[in-house]
Amino acid sequence: MRRTRSAKTTLVGGVMTGGTHPIDFTAAPSQGRSLDVRWIHGSESAKHNTDPDIQVHAYDAHTLILRQNMAVHCEAPFLFLLFGNDRAVLLDTGATAAAEFFPLRRTVDDLVGRWLAAHPRDRYELLVLHTHAHGDHVAGDGQFAGRPDTVVVGADRATAWAYLGLGADLDRVTTLDLGGRVLECLASPGHHEAAVTFYDAFTGFLFTGDTVYPGRLYVQDWAAFRDTIDRLVRFTETRAVSHVLGCHIEMTTTPGVDYPIRTTYQPDEPPLQMSPRRLRDVRAAIDEVDGRTGRHPYADFVICWEP
């Protein structure tokens, strides 16, 4: 049993600064900044872990990356909080429902409050969306129940895709306007039927959820997964992508070697960020695997296909 610690967060990286005028997210894109971050990665004894429940990294004044403590939940997912002029969007809500152990609502309220102190608004909305509907990405949804000016969109395919304007035409790319900061949304089934990829032109980030990340790529639908990777490769050929960001790290820095499932200590992690080349590497691996079931390790990821 892990000991209970007082809820705390750590903010590293950029400092939130600004004024009261609308931010022009097109005039000065925030691409090309460093993501050389030492992420919290658990400890040999989860009971004695002293890391914050949530680590927060400010990539810039309007873009925050959160990681859940591995001692709280072994999945240690990454979450993303993006600010626009009219509203912020939180992508995913982590793997733990209880605010006592995973104070996501409190953390987000604090971060939104800091942003609004620097950029006052009469009214400001929080939108909660998901990369897909697996439990380690939606568990914290309930913490936002009753929060004023907040919309939590269900993560199931029917609800999420309808909200984003996605549907039967999987090649269709839709947009989500946060107030001058526009995200592009792509249906991305394969790992999960409801998966969505988001692209933020301001940072150049492509948020791929569990479709592509430095770890075990679990495939639910082989044909859909292949087609999704094809679409993502084509998409990145016409966009300025600075980093591809998934929601987990499961590999070690030794090529082809991943950490054991349910580990709570990963001291030798590779970076979270990937280049668009990783998408092409995954696509080449799909051709090599050719639908064969089982576990197929590659240097930077493992394809896991068990229909």
What are these regions (language model features)?
Residues V153-D169, A195, G215, P267-G291:
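Active-site-proximal loop/helix segment associated with metal-binding centers of metalloenzymes
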Residues P52-A117, F198-T211:
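Conserved beta-strand hairpin/beta-sheet module of binuclear metal-dependent hydrolase folds
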Residues T26-A27, Q31-G32, A95-R181:
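Active-site HxH/HxHxD metal-binding segment of metal-dependent hydrolases
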Residues D60-I65, V173, V182-E184:
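Short, hydrophobic/aromatic-rich segments at coil-to-beta transitions
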Residues G13-N49, D230-P307:
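Accessory terminal helices/loops
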Residues A88, A95-A97, F102, E184-A187, ...:
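Metallo-beta-lactamase
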Residues H48, V72-E75, P189-H191:
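A short catalytic or substrate-binding loop motif that flags glycine-/basic-rich loops and adjacent residues
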Residues M1-M16:
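N-terminal amphipathic/basic-hydrophobic helices that include classical n-h-c signal peptides
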